[in-house]
């Protein structure tokens, strides 16, 4: 059985994040400045729509959590989930996201319409972890894995937008989350290490899968936008 120590797991999963981001068509093209500015706006508009529904994923973890009174301390896991969700709600993250969209040139985010791939990703966590055969601990591990993508992903975004697209304001949203999401991973994983009976291999695999899902979401959105523009041009 693999260790659940947060540092050891972080090293395993960060290597996974690094490899997937390096293989990503969207992040590779963004880093090189190869994406047209209007397509950059379109991709981040879809990210904004997904981000507006991200808090629901925490709700799935709460619904799937163990009842009070069991041998393991469910309170600690719930406490960490609530702390992370409270930061999502009270940190004016939505306001920062709107400022970022404004810096990209998106004046009216209400006009953005979700692509099917965005809706599918937003609902993927529910489809994967709500079934009775999936444990709440696996859901929390997956959520923690998604959080761990943030620092590396955000570093690519901030560097690329400032270097290739002249975006120098509105980036606080990504700078804030670089540290915040890493803290969320540590807090959630350390709580899991003390409170779970689930095989560590299943937890690490759930985290790996969600990392893959998140990077794939960006690539799927990018591909859908390129395909739509290609059809319009033909």
Across the structure, where does each feature detected by a protein language model lie?
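Non-heme di-metal
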Residues: 2-234
């Amino acid at each position: 059985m693999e260790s659940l120590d947060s540092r050891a797991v972080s090293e395993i999963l960060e290597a996974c994040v690094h490899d997937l981001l390096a293989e990503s068509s969207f992040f590779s093209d963004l880093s090189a400045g190869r994406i047209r500015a209007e397509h950059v706006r379109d991709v981040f508009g879809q990210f904004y729509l997904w981000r507006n529904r991200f808090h629901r994923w925490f709700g799935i973890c709460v619904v799937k959590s163990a009842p009070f009174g069991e041998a393991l301390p469910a309170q600690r896991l719930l406490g960490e989930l609530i702390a992370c969700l409270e930061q999502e709600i009270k940190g004016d993250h939505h306001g920062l996201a709107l400022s970022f969209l404004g810096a990209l040139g998106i004046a009216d985010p209400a006009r953005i319409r979700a692509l099917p791939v965005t809706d599918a990703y937003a609902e993927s966590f529910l489809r994967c972890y709500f079934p009775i055969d999936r444990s709440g601990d696996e859901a929390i591990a997956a959520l923690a894995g998604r959080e761990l993508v943030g620092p590396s992903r955000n570093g690519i975004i901030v560097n690329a937008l400032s270097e290739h697209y002249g975006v120098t304001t509105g980036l606080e949203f990504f700078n804030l989350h670089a540290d915040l999401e890493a803290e969320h991973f540590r807090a959630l994983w350390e709580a899991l290490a003390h409170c779970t009976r689930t095989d560590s291999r299943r937890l690490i695999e759930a985290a790996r899968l969600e990392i893959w899902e998140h990077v794939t979401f960006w690539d799927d959105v990018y591909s859908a936008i390129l395909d739509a523009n290609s059809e319009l041009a033909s």
